[in-house]
């Protein structure tokens, strides 16, 4: 198991002994992790430096899992946070920008060539989840009156329509998970318990229930 530490490193946890057996230094304030091609990709946001002269980080660290050392840092758009790997040797990164003149941006990393490209099909996103060759994304920048939802086929590299097909309205989406053919969207106002919206493979809501404050993940 790999764990990101906000002090700038990633740890490897032995699941048998439950001991941390190794650590590797990466970028500032590492966020999410994705494994592809025997490498670990780490989004470094630098989020704790947002108000300083240093500012946000704008790198993704590449860690060789055989040696557990950082072998490369890739430049991406400012403030990368979310990261997902597909089965085609690509890693997708959502950079949050600076919440002003640099917008949220979805990028694709080729894990063999390390080429980074921005997705023109769906340039903006806040959160994403992945399952079975498909990215499920939403864009809900602060102050937006109507959040946007979309799918992206990672095999054909084509954008689809919203994964919500029954007109269900979610005003303040907070996180998204894709598990077992279903998509779960959490809604939160940062003050009260959040709700979980459960959508089937047909895009229709089949259940909604209350969770705790700021629900992050469904597994």
Give, region by region, the residue ranges found by the protein language model.
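Predominantly soluble domains enriched in secretory-pathway, periplasmic, or organellar proteins
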Residues: 1-219
């Amino acid at each position: 198991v790999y764990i990101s530490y906000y002090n700038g490193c990633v740890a490897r946890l032995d699941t048998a002994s439950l001991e941390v057996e190794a650590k590797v230094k990466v970028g500032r304030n590492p966020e999410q992790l994705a494994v592809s091609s025997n490498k670990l990709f780490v989004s470094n946001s630098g989020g704790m430096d947002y108000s300083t002269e240093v500012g946000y980080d704008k790198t993704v660290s590449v860690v060789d899992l055989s040696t557990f050392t950082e072998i490369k840092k890739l430049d991406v758009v400012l403030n990368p946070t979310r990261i997902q790997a597909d089965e085609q040797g690509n890693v997708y990164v959502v950079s949050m920008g600076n919440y002003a003149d640099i917008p949220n941006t979805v990028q694709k990393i080729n894990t063999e060539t390390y080429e980074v490209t921005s997705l023109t099909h769906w340039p903006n996103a806040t959160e994403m989840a992945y399952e079975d060759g498909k990215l499920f994304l939403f864009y809900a920048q602060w102050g937006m009156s109507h959040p946007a939802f979309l799918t992206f086929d990672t095999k054909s590299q084509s954008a689809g329509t919203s994964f919500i097909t029954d007109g269900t309205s979610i005003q303040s989406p907070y996180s998204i998970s894709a598990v077992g053919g279903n998509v779960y969207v959490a809604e939160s106002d940062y003050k009260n318990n959040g709700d979980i919206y459960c959508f089937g493979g047909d895009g229709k809501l089949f259940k909604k229930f209350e969770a705790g404050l700021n629900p992050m993940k469904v597994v």
